[in-house]
């Protein structure tokens, strides 16, 4: 039993509040245990240079953390006059993950900007940002679709993420901060609702891990993501039937120009 009384294969309580921000085209507050992230989606007609004239859209992301989202105050990136390496890595991950669930031709020549602002951090902020980012992206696309700006709904797959790791020799799902800080192995998994992997980030922080342990972590993560996607579907209700109405364009989904 873990410090918060969860089983090793149990995700933290998850709550997603849809349309959390009044002005954004899509938004949500996602809570995974004590981790809380506000995510917004903004539609912009100015696509990156490599997409101009292509008729295709793009998804990009930004990630930041409030100074007191953590136990000790962190300096804002803007006050350091540069984006921290951690924030840069995370926002690239979020963008890549969400692009795997969109058809850029159906989106049209526009960009959706996903802003992830962590207001309270207790581990798993990047995975929560991806899971919440999908909801915000979905609602931004729905606005375009409902207003008949686009003909086809461009979201092709559900996308969600979770962390897994090895603590005290035990494979665990959805690590909180204390578990993450002492984990011998730390891994982040991103998958879609077809059971396909989008990204695997894994590091032996304290000790190497075996192939058998790796397989156990993948299976734990797969089970966790399936449960998280079930929550996403509950939040979207009947709207989730729109997902997958157009197929994925594999050629454009694999671009990583950022």
From Swiss-Prot:
Keyword Phosphoprotein: no
Record keyword tRNA processing present: yes
Protein's name according to its UniProt entry: Ribonuclease PH
Pfam families assigned: RNase_PH, RNase_PH_C
GO BP annotation list: rRNA catabolic process; rRNA processing; tRNA processing
Stated role: Phosphorolytic 3'-5' exoribonuclease that plays an important role in tRNA 3'-end maturation. Removes nucleotide residues following the 3'-CCA terminus of tRNAs; can also add nucleotides to the ends of RNA molecules by using nucleoside diphosphates as substrates, but this may not be physiologically important. Probably plays a role in initiation of 16S rRNA degradation (leading to ribosome degradation) during starvation.
EC number assigned by the record: 2.7.7.56
SUPFAM superfamilies listed in its UniProt record: Ribonuclease PH domain 2-like, Ribosomal protein S5 domain 2-like
Binding site for phosphate: 86, 124-126
Domain of life: Bacteria
GO MF annotation terms: 3'-5'-RNA exonuclease activity; tRNA binding; tRNA nucleotidyltransferase activity
Similarity comment: family membership: Belongs to the RNase PH family.
Catalytic activity: tRNA(n+1) + phosphate = tRNA(n) + a ribonucleoside 5'-diphosphate
Assembly and interaction partners: Homohexameric ring arranged as a trimer of dimers.
Top EC category: transferase
